[in-house]
Amino acid sequence: MKKKNLMCLFLAGTALLSSCEKDPDLSEMDGDFTVYTQYDPDMDFGGASTYYLPDSILTTGQGMQAAYWKDENAQTLISQVKEEMDGRGYTRSTEKTGADLGVQITYIENTVNMVGFTGGYWDGWWDPYYWGPFWGGGWYYPFPISYQYNTGNIVLELVDLRDSDEGESGKCLPVVWLANSEGMLSGSTRIDLTLVQRAIAQSFTQSSYIQKQ
């Protein structure tokens, strides 16, 4: 599969980009997902208090435009992430400005590889302006990445927004935690909502360092 680039996720002061793509359907699957998590050991998770979580799930749709999954199933998954973050002592912010952490949920529609990345700025399958101009000039992983995102995976990421200086357009932000849930198949296989919720819960269970002090 060819690599896909994503355009900016958020536009400050404007509505989210619309998409003509269908929302992913949900049906039963067998077996739990394999959940892979990784984080920046230098990140001060305990010092963060607030987080911003959008009301849609980003999808790696066709073409160069970002697509958004917003139906009731998407809202169920977003609520699951909110419950996990709230349970760790963080408070959801209704405004992007001033939030300590940014939370991103992504549904992978095209298999992609991230192999041999050893830190620093990433110029691979995701556009470096993935978080949009509001978050700064781009983003990067401060830890090594070397694996594949398969079609149907759900990926969770936390970005440290405290590294963003208001008005500094060239500032790149660190992705300080990611969770990749594998187990969803391509083709006619559809996502099972219950399994995704369990994978989200497992992502946080094996990430005890995400905790407000």
Which stretches of residues belong to each language-model region?
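C-terminal motif of bacterial Sec signal peptides marking the signal peptidase cleavage site
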Residues: 16-19
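Envelope-exposed proteins and targeting segments
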Residues: 47-49, 99-101, 150-154, 175-177
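N-terminal segment of the mature soluble domain
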Residues: 56-107
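Short secondary-structure boundary motifs at beta->alpha junctions and helix caps
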Residues: 163-202
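Bacterial N-terminal signal peptides that target proteins for export
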Residues: 1-7
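Post-signal peptide N-terminal segment of mature Sec-exported envelope proteins
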Residues: 29-47
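Bacterial lipoprotein signal-peptidase II cleavage site
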Residues: 21-26
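Low-complexity, compositionally biased segments in intrinsically disordered regions
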Residues: 104, 109-157
